[in-house]
């Protein structure tokens, strides 16, 4: 029956530890040597496919996570993707063919695919879904009816009451009775269908609102019951349902990790991070999924977001360097309206245009993916801090990172366990020499980092990260030769909205992968005449404009305009 009594719910919980372990052996950390996931929030499947080839594979990302692929409620808001109408692959991000092509393309690039999976509830309201399926609340023809829902039709109101959390409706969304055999079978069928197309793992949305034993039963029905799962179970002090209940089924997302990073970066000391992780009360490292932000928390404000500038970037650098959990790198789009859906309905023509932030491609972040892969299995060594906001540490004899979150530059000779030789600081593409004692000297500007690893032993024309943007249909390809010091970056701005309308804060960052040539392709309408200039920014936000008059150019009637410039001092 649809109703789960309180006694039954408690009985399920009492047996959850045994049931979860017995039915579905844990698969926590993603298998393989590459455990970083790029979370491409609301990117359509064609754009994800291209990104796997152009950036994610070459940068060393092990996984890409895509937003929910199933048919969903119509509407321009992002959250419509999280209101299923059916389990057909027919959402705003692409159809079954596009989904399969994306998986195959990503696999060819060496990137596995995780699908965000909404199995706790169905869509609210009534109408026609994105794939043409008619529905009304509690009635989803051919899939579920009212008897498949939990009997509590009220909105969750008491997180200290387990039955209320797991049997009532999350923000009025019809709550599936995951204790029913029919419901379990339908959910397993959906996940098996995705797996048949090549999906390698699943993020289980709203896992805390389903009993752990129910999820273990569903997982046991999968063709591969050991498939990678990552469960969203938000920690709340004093709540009836604890994220640790779900550790038997896979990675559990450790929300306290992101909240603690925000608190430290914004108001405490980086030196506190010396024992960050389990010693802070976080879940076991090998069963935890970690992140700096996700699509919910960046809007809710309980974690950092792209709007936090250097705090966000340095938190990401630390996360990827520190040996705790399996990291997610969130990559979304700019927003002022928290409900606003993706630009261009999820089509990404080029990074850093149309509001797409592409955090996964920021040099400071993407370069740390190879750092993490190289350092895998190595313990923290050579910890140093100044008792405040400058820290440094090694990962055995494989890697070393220094982070300066002070308000002024830091010059220091750092002691590492690296072999002597020439290295490339992957944060700035700057050569660094480690002497026979394992030492190097560097100056870090405020709010910057230096990162070395044994697989980056020279800076040259070979990109250490993929190109910043894929080709645009029409537009301008900016290529400017400019020298910088650690902490500085080159940007372009101009007299069009796509170029930031001359506002330094909205200028577009170029990629130094082929330093000293900085590159960026920007989509612009064919035939457009525009003015532009390059600027140099440091970590403190100081701006230096290149000298001389505004540069001028015109996009051709078809194709791209290629601009080869030199920064005018």
From Swiss-Prot:
Binds 1 Ca(2+) ion per subunit. Ca(2+) binds at residues 120, 166, 175, 209. Keywords: Calcium, Carbohydrate metabolism, Glycosidase, Hydrolase, Metal-binding, Signal. This is Alpha-amylase. Residues 1-28 form the signal peptide. CDD domains: AmyAc_bac_euk_AmyA (cd11317), CBM20_alpha_amylase (cd05808). Its EC number is 3.2.1.1. It comes from Streptomyces violaceus. Residues 468-569 form the CBM20 domain.
């Amino acid at each position: 029956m649809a109703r789960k009594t309180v006694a039954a719910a408690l009985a399920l919980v009492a047996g959850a530890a045994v049931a979860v372990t017995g039915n579905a052996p844990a698969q926590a950390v993603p298998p393989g040597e590459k455990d970083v996931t790029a979370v491409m929030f609301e990117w359509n499947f064609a754009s994800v496919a291209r990104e796997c080839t152009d950036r994610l594979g070459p940068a060393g990302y092990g996984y890409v996570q895509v937003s929910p692929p199933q048919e969903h409620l119509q509407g321009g808001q992002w959250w419509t993707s999280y209101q299923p109408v059916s389990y057909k692959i027919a959402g705003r991000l692409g159809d079954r063919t596009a989904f399969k092509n994306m998986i195959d393309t990503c696999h060819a690039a060496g990137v596995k695919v995780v699908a965000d999976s909404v199995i706790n509830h169905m869509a609210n309201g009534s109408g026609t879904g994105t794939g043409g399926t008619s529905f009304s609340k509690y009635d989803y023809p051919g899939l579920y009816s009212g008897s498949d829902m939990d009997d509590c039709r009220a909105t969750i109101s008491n997180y200290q009451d387990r039955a209320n959390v797991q049997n009532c409706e999350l923000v009025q969304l019809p709550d599936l009775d995951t204790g029913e055999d029919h419901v379990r079978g339908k959910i397993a069928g959906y996940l098996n269908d995705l797996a048949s197309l090549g999906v390698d793992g699943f993020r289980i949305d709203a896992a805390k609102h389903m009993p752990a034993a129910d999820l273990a039963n569903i997982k046991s029905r999968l063709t591969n019951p050991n498939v990678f799962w990552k469960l969203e179970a938000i920690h709340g002090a004093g709540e009836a349902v604890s994220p640790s209940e779900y550790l038997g089924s896979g990675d559990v997302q450790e929300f306290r990790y992101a909240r603690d990073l925000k608190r430290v970066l914004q108001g405490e000391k980086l030196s506190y991070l010396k024992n960050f992780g389990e010693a802070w009360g976080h879940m076991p490292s090998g069963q935890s999924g970690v992140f700096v932000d996700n699509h919910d928390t960046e809007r809710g404000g309980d974690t950092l977001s792209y709007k936090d500038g250097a705090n966000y970037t340095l938190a990401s650098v630390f996360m990827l360097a520190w040996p705790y959990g399996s990291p997610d790198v969130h990559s979304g789009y700019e927003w002022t309206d928290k409900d606003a859906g993706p630009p261009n309905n999820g089509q990404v023509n080029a990074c850093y245009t149309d509001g797409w932030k592409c955090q996964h491609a920021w040099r400071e972040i993407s370069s740390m993916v190879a750092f993490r892969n190289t350092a895998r299995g190595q313990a923290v060594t050579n910890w140093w801090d100044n008792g405040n906001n400058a820290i440094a540490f090694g990962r055995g004899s494989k890697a070393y990172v220094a982070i300066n979150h002070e308000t002024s530059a830091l010059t220091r000779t750092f002691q590492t366990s690296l072999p002597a030789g020439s290295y490339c600081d992957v944060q700035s593409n700057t050569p660094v020499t480690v002497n026979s004692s394992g030492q190097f000297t560097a100056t870090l500007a405020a709010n910057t980092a230096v990162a070395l690893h044994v697989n980056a032993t020279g800076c040259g024309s070979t990109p250490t990260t993929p190109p910043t943007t894929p080709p645009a249909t029409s537009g301008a390809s900016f290529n400017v030769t400019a020298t910088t010091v650690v902490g500085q970056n080159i940007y372009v701005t101009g007299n069009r909205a796509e170029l930031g309308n001359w506002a330094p804060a909205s200028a577009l960052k170029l990629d130094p992968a082929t330093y000293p040539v900085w590159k960026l392709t920007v989509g612009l309408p064919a035939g457009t005449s525009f003015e532009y200039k390059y600027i140099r920014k440091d970590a403190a936000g100081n701006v230096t404009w290149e000298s001389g008059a505004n540069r001028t150019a015109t996009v051709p009637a078809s194709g791209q305009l290629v601009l080869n410039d030199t920064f005018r001092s």
